[in-house]
């Protein structure tokens, strides 16, 4: 049995505050990692943690996120998958990253989400809708609704979850790299 890692993220900011008001939990972003240290993790979100207006598919860098949001908190789950599922998901994530500028954040979909109506525009996702679709298509998880209606709250409420970390992002960064004087200088995309 292999593992995939889902991170629920609590960050500050106006957009985060609005999402928090709608979904009623603090964790407003979700990312998927192929490893426990989040060296290779992906999501649909900000292309640069410092600029909220440009969003799409990206490889996340926990060190850059920590620089932008020093008070960010993470809750990390390990979920079971087969070796073949993990290989397939890794391939799909890397292909999406290779074509990352073809994937965009689905602003319009947020209004449909609020209305409870499924909506899909090609290559446009929220962080949770992308992850829900990927995990469902690879038979790792299923949700009782259309992938476009899945929110971080649905990941928060997963029944089969093994919490492996909950706390400040700084602690997760230190677990991944115990030399804190180094990580703020890592270039974007490495982690």
Whereabouts are the PLM-identified features?
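Cysteine-nucleophile amide-bond enzymes
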Residues: 1-191
